[in-house]
């Protein structure tokens, strides 16, 4: 089963901003009904793009610094953080959507299909995990 990581105010930079892979971040809260609908879609992304794209969850109530830093005003917010820098040398600006989106819409919104692991990478990761 693919791993979904949980980021805190203290671990967000390492898990997301300094990651060498693209990261889909689910900003959520325990009391948020629509956030519960998003969880299975995050599991699908984590499984389908395992090894190529990381999935991270952030509880906005428990981690207010992250929410404020990225101006998260509504939840669920799903954000996509691309590694590296743009042509000007600045980090890519994260893309985000508010509300539930099925896997197919998230793939299109964030152009995720370009990050699918190559079959050789998948096989070597499965072999090294065994």
Where are the predicted features?
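Conserved Rossmann-like nucleotide-binding pocket used by diverse enzymes
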Residues: 8, 28, 54-56
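Short pre-active-site segment immediately N-terminal to redox-active cysteine/selenocysteine motifs
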Residues: 20, 28-31, 74
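A short beta-strand-turn-helix
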Residues: 4-23
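Structural microenvironment flanking redox-active thiols in thiol-disulfide oxidoreductases
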Residues: 58-67
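Non-catalytic, surface beta->alpha helical segment in thiol-disulfide oxidoreductase systems
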Residues: 74, 80-123
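Hydrophobic beta-strand anchors of alpha/beta hydrolase catalytic cores
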Residues: 24-25, 55, 78
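The canonical Cys-X-X-Cys-His
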Residues: 32-35, 78
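Typically the conserved alpha-helix immediately C-terminal to a functionally engaged Cys/Sec
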Residues: 34-49
């Amino acid at each position: 089963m693919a791993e979904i990581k949980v980021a805190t105010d203290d671990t967000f930079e390492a898990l997301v901003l300094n990651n060498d892979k693209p990261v889909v971040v689910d900003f959520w809260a325990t009391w948020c009904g629509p956030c519960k609908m998003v969880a299975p879609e995050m599991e699908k992304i984590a499984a389908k793009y395992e090894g190529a794209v990381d999935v991270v969850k952030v509880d906005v109530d428990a981690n207010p610094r992250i929410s404020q830093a990225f101006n998260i005003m509504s939840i669920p917010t799903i954000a996509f953080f691309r590694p590296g820098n743009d042509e000007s040398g600045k980090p890519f600006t994260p893309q985000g959507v508010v509300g539930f989106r099925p896997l197919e819409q998230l793939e299109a919104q964030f152009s995720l299909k370009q990050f699918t692991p190559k079959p050789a990478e998948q096989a070597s990761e499965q072999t090294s995990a065994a």
